[in-house]
């Protein structure tokens, strides 16, 4: 049964025609419904290789219940089937049968799967463009031999149904179909077709225009009768199509426009054009032009710019117009009737035209003499296919007949070159032109070097230079391109006909030079299969290939093994050799280790295509094409992902115009290869039908923007017609360094206005560097930086530039020495010149390797190309990656003199010149040796890589062993000549002998000797490199480059990789997959274990694990042995190299080993699980050993079986642990080594349980909280670094919708959203979530509770970084009272910049950490440095995790904290970003954002700010629910509905809420309840308010009772849907300090519906308590109770005036009262401002709000005491403005009204200064002093004057508060009357004594903010109430008309009328108030439901 099921599945897979059907059939197995999505996702797939996950998956069905044995068997069978099927894809027979298309989930380029036996039917159902879609799916083979048109209709209908393709309805089409016999291709033809290089990568249109019928003769022209030909010409060019496919119509609109504006001049400049056979058709020029108008594709592909004519010409110099016309006819057919054109019919045969071949060739070659100076026919490299006999004929006749004097080199050569391209139809038309250039080879060779050899992405570029001596072994034109352009490569021996480029095409299969067709077919079928396998494997290789591509690109052609090996000068040459060897080994081994995992998926070779590597560096953050492309092939950008791409910036700059070089070449790179898979990438799998809609197209943009870029007047714009046309067809070319074509549009990046508009200097810099690449030695101009006028803007500048550019590429600029290796060398290096960091060094290699330069030239060279990197206008992101390029580019060291001569001292200049001369001499000496040895070694490497798949067989297994050893044997004699190496290695082997024995015992392999042999050969080389680098410092460039710690670590990584590769290459497939499942995901992290100090640290923590012996996976022991010997040997090298000599190194090692003499193998074996071991190593690899030793000390002081909670409590209570370490070690004590399996599965389908709302009442969260919660959830799902597929419309829209959801959640409370002016929603342009969050909130808003709640809800590690270690003194600001803050130690100035990881003895460090009192200052500084290092190393080890940095404002840069600040920034934003796997979320919090250093608020740092506000009541419920739920308690379902309890305010801030929660939970625990009900909340509120009766007593002052009753009554009457706080007779003593919780409640409820009428209602609420107290509480309170009552009244006054200020801020520019007649329905005249405030008023208001009170007090009060009288107003004003502290007014009610962050003053400066704590200042603008005023001044009050008639607002200052608002009508000014002192109104004050008492106090400063000024004054409260009454009485009497005109009257009128309204309201409800008072006194508590 099992075998039968297996076969059925195989058959079903083969016959699949639809991806949807495939997925449907697959998902029929319900237990594997999620298996598909997991299996084909890279990270999930890796997880699934874990056996434990499989055991869970296979033991459960989709419902989660444990299933029977059937499910397990079924899952195993399906897994085996999947593996076998993937193997079958790569099988050659499977390829030929072409029946398996895994299009749905494996987007494999389909042309790599099946042979090209495409027939008429397959191409019938689509038009040209939509052919791209059909490529994703082929019809089954049953349709191949069909000739019936009805069946064809069915085929087309099927295709149309699935893919929205276009069906041609023309009946003649079907007639023509039946006229031609359709035959099945023969197998040989299929093989040849597979072998055709034109098939490996499909070109742009992918239309099968010319590749349909294989059965015709490939040599002769297809015989087609004229009648049929005529019919084909008459077919409509634009077939019928559906409405959504209108793009093709726009194409022809553009073509019609072009044909009317562009003149076509047929030029016949060659005599050979007249050599036309008589029997050819004659057509005049006019017919030809008219014909072309019918077929405008012709001239679109062949418009070449002639410099002399300034027009577009069709160059067909060697053939007649008639022959061209015939070719055009064929091309027309290829477009109109693509199904009827024989591909082989285009094989241009000279015999078929009756032309004398000898005469023809002679004429053609001779005719080039006159035109060679005018232009070079480097034609658009069009896709071509020729026949062998034609080439042989041409070659033979060329050898016979061509004149020898045409070549400078008498040895005759033949040049045949062509390139993949867009068009496949006019191939022979271009082919003949290519042959013209055979004659003038020397002339074009350098041009081709400059252009075509940089075009390494053309896999099918054939550019062979063959000598006539080769004879029959001549290079066949169909072979894959060979870059054997140089003569010495063509001199290979006959046995060495395969030359490989090992680092680019790792397993590229080439056809050998012999013309054996069988070998040709075989190898080409392999090539096609290999390419297919490459893409299969790449689908799952997201960042396994990225490292390889990036590194290989930098140094891909520069491994010249013996370039500088000078055996006479070993030490110097070794540096050069190692710089290449190490980089090569690193690249090869990285690729090997990264590609091995896919051998068990893809058994074939894995060619790495050139285009993928170069696309890698062009990824732009906003470029949809590149994003789509890279996502489709599975690449991910790591270090360049935030970098502006060097050649392709974004959506706009990708439309660059073609860079037309009219002088020397004619658009040579316009039609470079566009790979088939790149086209497929546009057909997004999720949105296949809409991939061509107008929104995603450029057709409409082009057709509607003709004035900008299709203007025929400007030749530069016209030169971009072709490129713009192709850009219009949705394929913007990737501007590789090989594609020198800029796309010109209205946003052409060279335009100055665009650059200025963008305000990004990086654009100038990028393209400036690009042009510097072009103009290498004739540096015409530079565009680096600045806003220069570029030379490409106007027509008159084009000509000189063209001439200069053409001169650059003409060979007189190149050396004529005959040494062709120069060009090989230069061309090999060219592909990396687009990298501005590497470019200059490459030039150094190229120029120096050719000819020695003079001293002056060298100086000029350095000034030109070796400018300091700091001068390159690097952006932040580029500069960040600079070190990465420097580290990995070994060429930077060859001549690294980054500063020009003028900056160097004379001595240094001489040394550098001598050094350069030596380098030049070496370059000459080893030229010959390089030619023989280097490529010999490379060939061996290539053999090794080509046959790598053989290692699955025993034969290949043995062969590879020998080959591997043979490859390294060439290097061994060179390396083994150093005696130092021998001693070092012997030392290593001796000291690690026990480790080697253990390893040998564990392995028990017969190949042990082989491993030893390889190790002996390879290990010493790398160790020697480290030693020599440290001991030979003659070259400052090399030593500086390779001495950095990163490079040292990298060198050890190479050694490590080498050991792994030796084993893995020789291992069976199953074992490789097993090793990969455990090691591959951790491999990059394990590498850092090789640092020796960490080796010792690792031993300390292993005590924590119980001893558990088991036969573990012994491959890890290989790792561990390598770690052990590395740690032992390299520590000694480090110690001796660090300056202390060998003794120092040995001493340090021995001192460390003294106490910890434990073998690493034994320690690791303690850990039971292999995965646990790797996870443990990862989690602890970066921890500083000091903390680990302390932890080990903990383990020794407690029993081993204690649980972590006891350890944690011991840490908290132990005196032997320093406070600095305590907080950190608690986190460390609960360190988990790996995630649980349920967490891994949970991460795939996760839901937030706390997001549920079971309480049945409205519970909401703040938007910032929601965003953070979503962010944490996304991080848990490993999506933090997910690169969104920006060209996938569905994914983009999904992300944007999700982004809107998490960022713009409504904070609704039954009211509308905010009505602030211009309050728009934010929008992020970058499709990525922010990994850095800055949480801003006032003190008490609960930032720490929010972050801790998120950490509680996430299973990710939560690590707190305490920055108070960095502060050099006591804090000047109050810390957030709810944030964690330790005691702050005074650490003094930090000027010690020693190494952080200083090696100290263990005892010393423990003593330092546990006995702080014995520390010196230096030791304390060292510990401070150690502390931050310890924290961040743990963070990196624990990744992914959440970092919380509370009070980040403490980290401001000053002289003492700059070191810490640099450490923090470096750890957070440089180290973490280097690794693509980092998934760290950084959350910083502050309540003083102005103190946060701006460097931290940057796009790649804390780029998202979240403002946390005080909680609204629904948010309080949510928070309360969360706090309860996370502790295991649940709320009653309808708790907030019962008895109106839902409106109760639970706390004025988050701390109160937490305290209430704790109180309620404690009550629930005592009552043994797990559900919290209403009674528990009541009890908790009651107990919390009572405060256990210790600080609470009943209030004796009945005034406060009346105050509460009045406030509650007003709330109930006016705002029925708002919250009402319970009232009681109990009041805390603290209430006078904290203020009522109602303050912020009312304001924030108000904030959600900010309307004028709402403001009035709230204003009445705020005044209600005071009014009732004034009316009822007549008895004078005593002093103590007056304090509490006053605070409430004072807060009310603040809130009243705050509301008025809010109204002024919101509606300051509202209409005046007379303008509101049209708004009668919504007319609230009280709240209309007469006019907006002017800026001068704002400044004056700000100046009057805060004054440096110390200055005023000291300067002025002393003068008053001396009796000097009135001061000079001007002097006061100057002093005032010189000492102003800008801030909003202090009267804001304690930050409740507007938080200090949200409420800036009118100047936009937020409020921080608390500058007057203790002085009273009265502002007045009256010069004369009245009696009362004199009394005030004499009693110590200060009076001063600001500018006359400018300040309209004045005020009293109490100790930190205003008595009234400065704009209060107490102090308003009359505009129409003379100034009158406000204090002249005697009736305002009850009496003079009351006024004195109210406004005077002791002049001394109070000790705290809570010390009220009126405490020492008797009966102050009573007088205050009288003041209120008299104030209202006075306001009622002030009815002067001028009063109503003043700016401040609206406020006085509002307050007056509101007071009257409330008085009438309460007097009319006196009975109700009396009843409430009695009830309150009886019940002691009144809740809102009882008040109703």
UniProtKB/Swiss-Prot annotation:
Compartmental location: Plastid, Chloroplast stroma
SUPFAM superfamilies: P-loop containing nucleoside triphosphate hydrolases
Cited CDD domains: RecA-like_Ycf2
Matching Pfam families: AAA, Ycf2
Record keywords: ATP-binding, Chloroplast, Nucleotide-binding, Plastid
Binding, ATP: 1337-1344
Gene3D superfamilies with a match to the protein in the record: P-loop containing nucleotide triphosphate hydrolases (3.40.50.300)
Region (Disordered): 1377-1396
Record keyword Nucleotide-binding present: yes
GO molecular-function term, one example from the UniProt record: ATP binding
GO cellular component: chloroplast stroma
KW tRNA-binding (keyword) present: no
Function field: Probable ATPase of unknown function. Its presence in a non-photosynthetic plant (Epifagus virginiana) and experiments in tobacco indicate that it has an essential function which is probably not related to photosynthesis.
Family (UniProt): Belongs to the Ycf2 family.
Protein name: Protein Ycf2
Annotated source species: Cucumis sativus
Gene: ycf2-A
